[in-house]
């Protein structure tokens, strides 16, 4: 039986007539197939229709982005795909310069998320999507790990006569073992001036080295050019930029581990009496930041941050695990300080002394899983209510499903922090008078 009239070639194919006949005969026992030998995409598929079979030859290649290219995204980049700021920074925003305004909170959250990407992705996002000016990407040396493991980038609102400078540290990368070594190393470093602080975070900034058991004495002019140290290089970079942009102020920000680095960077500006730099500080924003030091360190920072306008914005989302670490107990004695800008699972914000369940007690075992189920359901419908920009990626949805088993991990996603800033109050005011608990 010949069915050549019932077989249509939809695309060009490299199959010869004989090959096509053999294929169809082998699969279906049919003979007499008419084909043409013309070019192709590759990969053969059979399309069924009533009384008709269509043979389509599609040939192509799997495109794997090259690591370090503009197309190569980190895991975080696949979790959070939003590329645009909530609102472009206007001259009015820059003239008022209110650090608690949503405009600055949003750019801080977005920069903290973007910090997980490579230099080319960051530059493209900043220049093309944010319409800002990319200044530089840094890869800093860690003496303890004996490798470059601390990343940061700097941007300005514009290239000439900038009013805003943003410094963003990279947080903990999901598949980077060195980051977990830093996070889970609960060793102290005792500073006479400021109290005890997390040694691993200090080493990531190039401010300490346990192998020589003393504070780092590096200075910019004596550093190995191939082993740049974060604190010293960024401090000098800010001085240079503020010399060029005399009307500018700066924000330091990050998510996760990077939040701890941002906070310690600020602390060392106080220790080293960098008063001219500190006068230009607009705000420090941390998202899901772990504890950094002991009570003495907290008292030191509170005394330095006592100003009429709040500077320190510590944002915590729901059951995020990382802000509850290292533990605040008799053994570890790590403590947060200042006001916690806490967002619940519905993105409602309130000021607290500390986030609920501060030490991950088993009392919350069932409630946090109920919350995780709610967060999963909410993520599936939020974009219908609030707009397409809140539609989550498949990877983000999968992470929320996994989060029912380990809720604190999925709650740490930058997706939650960007949602919180955009759906929460238009202005944050972390003052003690607003604390509710």
What is the predicted role of each segment?
Residues 1-66:
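Short phosphate/oxyanion-binding micro-motifs
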Residues 59-253, 257-437:
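Non-catalytic, mobile gating and regulatory segments of ester bond hydrolases
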């Amino acid at each position: 039986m010949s069915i050549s009239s019932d077989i249509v070639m939809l695309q060009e194919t490299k199959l010869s007539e004989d090959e096509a006949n053999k294929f169809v005969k082998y699969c279906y026992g049919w003979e007499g197939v008419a084909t043409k030998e013309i070019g192709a995409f590759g990969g053969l598929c059979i399309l069924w229709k009533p009384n008709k079979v269509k043979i389509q030859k599609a040939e192509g290649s799997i495109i794997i982005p090259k690591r370090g290219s503009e197309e190569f995204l980190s895991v975080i980049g696949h979790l959070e795909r939003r590329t645009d700021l909530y609102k472009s920074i206007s001259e009015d925003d820059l003239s008022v310069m209110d650090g608690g305004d949503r405009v600055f909170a949003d750019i801080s959250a977005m920069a903290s998320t973007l910090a997980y990407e490579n230099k080319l992705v960051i530059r493209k996002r900043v220049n093309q999507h944010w319409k800002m000016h990319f200044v530089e990407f840094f890869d800093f040396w860690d003496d303890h790990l004996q490798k470059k493991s601390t990343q940061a980038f700097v941007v300005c609102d514009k290239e000439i006569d900038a009013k805003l400078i943003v410094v963003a540290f990279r947080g903990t990368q999901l598949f980077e073992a060195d980051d977990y070594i830093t996070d889970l190393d609960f060793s102290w470093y005792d500073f006479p001036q400021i109290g005890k602080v997390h040694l691993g975070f200090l080493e990531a900034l190039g401010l300490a080295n346990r192998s020589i058991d003393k504070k780092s004495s590096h200075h910019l002019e004596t550093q190995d050019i191939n082993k740049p140290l974060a604190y010293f290089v960024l401090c000098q970079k800010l001085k240079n930029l503020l010399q060029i942009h005399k009307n500018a102020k700066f924000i330091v920000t990050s998510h996760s581990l990077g939040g701890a680095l941002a906070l310690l960077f600020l602390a060392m500006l106080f220790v080293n009496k960098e008063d001219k730099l500190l006068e230009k500080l607009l705000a420090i924003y941390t998202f899901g930041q772990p504890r950094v030091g002991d009570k003495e360190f907290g008292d030191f920072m509170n005394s330095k941050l006592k100003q009429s306008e709040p500077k320190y914005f510590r944002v915590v989302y729901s059951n995020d695990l990382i802000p509850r670490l290292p533990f605040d107990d008799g053994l570890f004695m790590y403590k947060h300080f200042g006001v916690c800008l806490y967002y619940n699972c519905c993105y409602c914000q309130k000021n607290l002394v500390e986030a609920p369940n501060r030490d991950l007690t088993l009392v919350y075992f069932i409630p946090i899983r109920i919350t995780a189920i709610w967060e999963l359901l909410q993520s599936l419908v939020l974009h219908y209510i609030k707009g397409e920009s809140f539609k989550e990626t498949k990877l983000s949805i999968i992470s929320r499903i996994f989060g029912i088993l380990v809720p604190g991990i999925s709650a740490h996603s930058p997706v939650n922090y960007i949602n919180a800033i955009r759906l929460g109050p238009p202005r944050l005011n972390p003052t003690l008078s607003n604390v509710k608990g």
